C-alpha cells in the first residue's frame, strides 16, 4: 500500500515541501533563516490576534487599551512584548536571510528573489503601520514624518498624503485604517511566502559553493527538520531572554508618553530596523532626493542579479568580493548607528559618506572587483 503522505492531495503538498524534498547535503546554518522567518510570522500572527482582541483603534482609547493589555489582561504584558520584540527578531532573521542570498548568489533564482524583495517591502509596511497603533509620541510623530515624505511627489504629493491620512493631519481616520492594514498585511505576507516557496522548489536550494548539487541531494526530513528545530529553539531562547529580561531595550521611551500633536519629540526616529534607510533619507538635504534615495536603498536589491559580473555564483572562493561584502555590512551597521543620532556635526558628514559608500559598493565596486577576479582566474 502506498504511503498516505504521497497520495493524499493535501499531504502530498506538505510531503513535497518539508519531508521528501531533495536538499543539498552541504547547506550551512545560514540556510536556517527561511524556516525561522516562517516561525516568526506564525508567532506574530498569533500574538497579534490575541492583542487585537483587547485593542481599540481609536485615538482617545488606543494608548489606554495598550496599558490595559499590559496591566489587566492575563499575561497581556507577555503577549505585547513578545509581539514587539518578535518584530525585532523577524527583521534580524530577514536581514540575515538577505545577506545570505547576497553572499552565496541565491539572487540568481530571479523569481524567488523578486518575490523576496516584495516580501521585504510588505513586512516593512506592516511593521511601520504596526508601530503607529500604540498611539504614543513616537507612534504619532513617526507616522506624521514618514507619511509626509509622499508630499515630495510632484503635483499629486499633498493630495496623496491627505488621502492616506483621511483628513488634514494624522488623526482618528489614520489610526483606524492603519489598524486595518496591520491586520490584513500578515495574511498577504503568508500568501506571498507560499509563492516564494513555490518558485524556490521549482529550482531547488542553492548551496555555499554555488555549484549545482543535483548529484548530491538528501531528503529534507530528518536531516534538515532536526537542524531547523535547533535553530527554532535558539530563536525562541533569544526572544524569551529579550522579552523577559529587557523588554524595552529596543523600544523608544517616548512611546510611553501618549501622542500629543502640540509637542514634538526632540529626536524623531523609527524602530532600529529602519534606521539604516532613515540615515540615507536624512543624508540628502533635498526632500525629493532623500525620498528617492530611501526608495532606492531597498529597491536596489531588485537590480542585484543584473549586476552579477562574476563567472562564479557564490563568494565562497572570492576573497576580494568577500572583503567588499563585509565592508557593506559594516557600512549598514554604521548607517544604523547614524540613523539613531541627532542631526549635527560629525554625524551629518559620517551619514553622507556612509550613504555614498553604500551605493558605491553595490553599483560600482562589487561588479568591478568581480571582473578583476575573473581576470585573475583567467576566466
From Swiss-Prot:
- PANTHER family the UniProt entry points to: CYTOCHROME B
Q: Name one GO biological process term.
A: mitochondrial electron transport, ubiquinol to cytochrome c
Keyword flag Transmembrane helix: yes
State how the cofactor is bound: Binds 2 heme b groups non-covalently.
A Pfam family recorded for this sequence: Cytochrome_B
Keywords associated with the record: Electron transport, Heme, Iron, Membrane, Metal-binding, Mitochondrion, Mitochondrion inner membrane, Respiratory chain, Transmembrane, Transmembrane helix, Transport, Ubiquinone
Record function comment: Component of the ubiquinol-cytochrome c reductase complex (complex III or cytochrome b-c1 complex) that is part of the mitochondrial respiratory chain. The b-c1 complex mediates electron transfer from ubiquinol to cytochrome c. Contributes to the generation of a proton gradient across the mitochondrial membrane that is then used for ATP synthesis.
Recorded hits in PROSITE patterns, A to Z, give:
CYTB_CTER, CYTB_NTER
In which compartments does the protein localize? Mitochondrion inner membrane
Query: Which InterPro entries does this chain map to?
Result: Cyt_b/b6_C, Cyt_b/b6_C_sf, Cyt_b/b6_N, Cytb/b6-like_sf, Cytochrome_b, Cytochrome_b_C_euk/bac, Cytochrome_b_N_euk/bac, Di-haem_cyt_TM
Q: How does it assemble?
A: The cytochrome bc1 complex contains 11 subunits: 3 respiratory subunits (MT-CYB, CYC1 and UQCRFS1), 2 core proteins (UQCRC1 and UQCRC2) and 6 low-molecular weight proteins (UQCRH/QCR6, UQCRB/QCR7, UQCRQ/QCR8, UQCR10/QCR9, UQCR11/QCR10 and a cleavage product of UQCRFS1). This cytochrome bc1 complex then forms a dimer.
Question: Does the keyword section mention Magnesium?
Answer: no
Q: Name one GO cellular component term.
A: respiratory chain complex III
Which cofactor is recorded for it?
heme b
- Origin organism is Peponocephala electra (Melon-headed whale)
Gene3D superfamilies linked: Cytochrome Bc1 Complex, Chain C
Q: What is this protein called?
A: Cytochrome b
Residues holding heme b b566 = 97, 196
Q: Which gene encodes it?
A: MT-CYB
Q: Where does a ubiquinone bind?
A: 201
Got any disulfides in this one, which pairs? none
| Residue positions binding heme b b562 | 83, 182
Q: What is the lineage of its organism?
A: Eukaryota, Metazoa, Chordata, Craniata, Vertebrata
How is this protein situated with respect to the membrane? Multi-pass membrane protein
Transmembrane segment boundaries:
33-53, 77-98, 113-133, 178-198, 226-246, 288-308, 320-340, 347-367
